Amino acid sequence: MYLAREMDLAILPSRRLVKFKAFTKRSLSMDEIELASLSSRAFLFNFLPLLLLLAFLDIFASSNASFLAAVLIKILVKSVFSALGSSLKSFTSGSRASDCLAALEFFDIFLAMLCFRRYLTSIVKEKTTFCRLCSHIQYF
């Protein structure tokens, strides 16, 4: 049991704990750290594939789809990103410490997703081949 808690603590980088302390002005107990680690990992496994799919759809819409399909995909992408942003606000307004820490974890994932989307868009705009795109992603 103690080893599992140490592993959960190791999964959460100290940078996020510093952010959390600055955000709430208090320290965390081991149970709160463990709960936040589990909830952020569950969020990652549930929503990251959807975000990746939406990023590829958004790139497809901006590069070679018809106008109507491009508009529909853009609306879908923007609505999902705004829904995720509002869920971040509800996480942050929660009273439990684990919810706040999970919101910070989600915000880091969200920022990484936006950077990944910009990176893929820049590659597609260069009109590279699919093999070159795969080699870029391999070294990303």
Swiss-Prot record:
It is found in: Membrane. One of its GO terms (cellular component) is membrane. It comes from the Eukaryota. Keywords: Membrane, Transmembrane, Transmembrane helix. The chain crosses the membrane at residues 42-62, 65-85, 96-116. Coiled coil: none annotated. It is a multi-pass membrane protein. Partially overlaps ECM1. This is Putative uncharacterized membrane protein YAL059C-A. It comes from Saccharomyces cerevisiae (strain ATCC 204508 / S288c).
